[in-house]
Swiss-Prot record:
One annotated GO molecular function: abscisic acid binding
Transmembrane recorded as keyword: no
Protein name: Major pollen allergen Car b 1 isoform 2
Lineage: Eukaryota, Viridiplantae, Streptophyta, Embryophyta, Tracheophyta
GO BP, sorted A to Z: abscisic acid-activated signaling pathway; defense response
Signal peptide start-end: none
Natural source organism: Carpinus betulus (European hornbeam)
InterPro entries, A to Z: Bet_v_I/MLP (IPR000916), Bet_v_I_allergen (IPR024949), Plant_def-hormone_signal (IPR050279), START-like_dom_sf (IPR023393)
Family per record: Belongs to the BetVI family.
């Protein structure tokens, strides 16, 4: 089994604490609301939202991915860090055993934030994961982040 790493970062005009609260802590409710064309539902199928919780994300009709199940590994409210592992779903295919993501939101100069994502793709057997496959996960996260960001810009009184 090989492990393939992918790192990316993006910026947001939303302050780190507010973005963490909306995107991570309330993502189960907010993401389907702000991006129904991509995600139809996010639900905890096991646990209360903390470490060990299993979440099921169901993607909207027409998406190449039907669903994924993620296990929450860590939520650090002080350092705005969220670690989770994709453990099930057609996104894994026959190449991947799991995908682990570490997401950290840090304050950026000027009041916005920097979102840093580090992903580890754990391949089954001798399969290899190419850059395009790894980039797809980042692009989906970026789209969801931008939808949350737009919502927060339009609803300035929420998630403060």
């Amino acid at each position: 089994m090989g492990v393939f790493n992918y790192e990316a970062e993006t910026t947001s005009v939303i302050p780190a604490a507010r973005l963490f609260k909306a995107f991570i802590l309330d993502g189960n409710k907010l993401i389907p609301k702000v991006s129904p064309q991509a995600v139809s539902s996010v639900e905890n199928v096991e646990g209360n939202g903390g470490p060990g919780t299993i979440k099921k994300i169901t993607f909207s009709e027409g998406s190449p991915v039907k669903y994924v199940k993620e296990r929450v590994e860590e939520i650090d409210h002080t350092n705005f860090k969220y670690n989770y592992t994709v453990i099930e779903g057609d996104v894994l295919g026959d190449k991947l055993e799991k995908v682990s993501h570490e997401l950290k939101i840090v304050a950026a100069p000027g009041g916005g934030s920097i979102v840093k994502i580090s992903s580890k793709f754990h391949a089954k057997g001798y399969h290899e994961v190419n850059a395009e496959e790894m980039k797809g996960a980042k692009e989906m996260a970026e789209k969801l982040l931008r939808a949350v960001e737009s919502y927060l810009l339009a609803h300035t009184a929420e998630y403060n």
